[in-house]
Every structure is written in structure tokens, then in C-alpha cells.
Regions:
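Glycine-rich phosphate-binding P-loop
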Residues: 41-64
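AAA+/P-loop NTPase substrate/partner-engagement loops
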Residues: 65-99
Length: 208
């Protein structure tokens, strides 16, 4: 019924020796219940701001302990800590840290499993946060040029952008379009504009 390990141990400390079995049972039950289902309620939020502005603290203050934080992007153990009970998935310190095509899958509503060292882990999270010091438009700047179609798909995955300011202000943009309009940013990153001809830039905007 959704009782956590801590709550079980509070009821009866004797179950401490059975925690591993309980975790396995919980994993099997949740995988059976949630596996293959479309996450129609999935919300993907991009959070950015300078170090020390409270980006990570915001997650822990607003959500339960069922949070999986990804910090290691090297090797095949990135998702080792992911559990079926994790409703919130956080990509911390994200700087083009995962290939764009993989990120598109992880942020999609359709059933997907993420690779880990021992067995692939299904992603059941209904809230995904991408946290970075980088402004949103800096992510995947190369792909904006060489694979604009995939980049457009990435833009469609993002439901909300939150900007954390040094003075403590949090500005929320309820869509990528709202953010781009407010910041007067073109679809192609401003970090790459000097390397692209006017004709190429216009074609990319027009989806050609």
C-alpha cells in the first residue's frame, strides 16, 4: 500500500533482516503494475542558475524521499540507484552529459528502461528535473546545428523552465516558447551563431 521501508521498521523493527526481500518484492510488484504503461502525467522541468542559488535544495524541499539523483554520467552505472519507487528523477549538474537521442527516450512518455551495470532499470518517474549551471539554450549546442530535428524533439520534451537568481528570485517559464520569447533567443543557440551563415541559420529556424 505504498509503505516505505522506514515506516515498516517503525511498525516492527524485526523486519530489518527482511529488508532485502521486501525490496525485491516491491520491485517485482511495481514493475508488474507500472510496466508497459504510458506516463501521460510526465512533467519535465529544466532548472538553471549559478552555484549556490538553491536549485538542488528546491527539489528536496518540495518532494518526498522517493527521489533518484543522477550525478555520475560515466560508464554504464549511471542508473544503478534507480528504483521503481522513484517518482522523481533528477539529472544533476547536467552539461550535455547524456547523448541527445538517449535523453529523448528518458524524457518521453512511453515505457523505457535505462542501462545499469547489472540489469536495465525501468523509469517510472512522473517528474524529471534537469539541473544545470548552464542556461537552457547552451545545452546540445552542437546538435542544434547538426541534428536540428532531434533538438526540436528535445524542446518538445521540456514542459517548464525555472531560472534561479542570485538574489533568491525564482522565475518560472511555463513553456520553452515562453522562455525563448522572454529572452529573445532564436531556436539555434546564440553560442553558435557566429559559426553559421545567415542562410543556414534561417533554414534551421524554418526546419529546412
Amino acid at each position: 500500500n505504498g509503505v516505505s521501508n522506514a515506516e515498516i521498521l517503525e511498525i516492527n523493527p524485526e523486519f530489518a533482516k527482511e529488508i532485502t526481500i521486501l525490496d525485491k518484492l516491491r520491485y517485482d510488484i511495481l514493475t508488474h503494475e507500472k510496466g508497459g504503461k504510458i506516463r501521460l502525467n510526465l512533467e519535465v522541468t529544466y532548472i538553471f542558475g549559478d552555484t549556490g542559488t538553491g536549485k538542488s535544495r528546491y527539489i528536496w524541499e518540495h518532494f518526498s524521499d522517493e527521489v533518484c539523483v543522477i550525478t555520475n554520467y560515466k560508464g554504464n552505472g549511471t542508473f544503478d540507484g534507480l528504483k521503481p519507487t522513484h517518482d522523481v528523477l533528477v539529472f544533476e549538474e547536467f552539461r550535455d552529459s547524456i547523448k541527445l537521442k538517449d535523453m529523448l527516450n528518458y524524457c518521453d512518455i512511453y515505457p523505457i528502461s535505462a542501462p545499469s551495470r547489472y540489469a536495465d532499470k525501468p523509469i517510472f518517474a512522473t517528474k524529471i528535473f534537469i539541473i544545470s549551471n548552464w542556461k537552457f539554450e547552451k545545452q546540445y549546442s552542437e546538435e542544434q546545428i547538426i541534428d536540428p530535428e532531434s533538438y526540436q524533439a528535445f524542446l518538445r520534451r521540456i514542459h517548464k523552465i525555472m531560472e534561479f537568481k542570485k538574489d533568491g528570485e525564482i522565475i518560472t517559464y511555463n513553456s520553452v516558447n515562453e522562455y525563448f520569447k522572454e529572452k529573445n533567443i532564436s531556436i539555434v543557440s546564440e553560442f553558435k551563431l557566429e559559426k553559421v551563415s545567415d542562410e543556414t541559420f534561417q533554414n534551421l529556424i524554418n526546419g529546412k
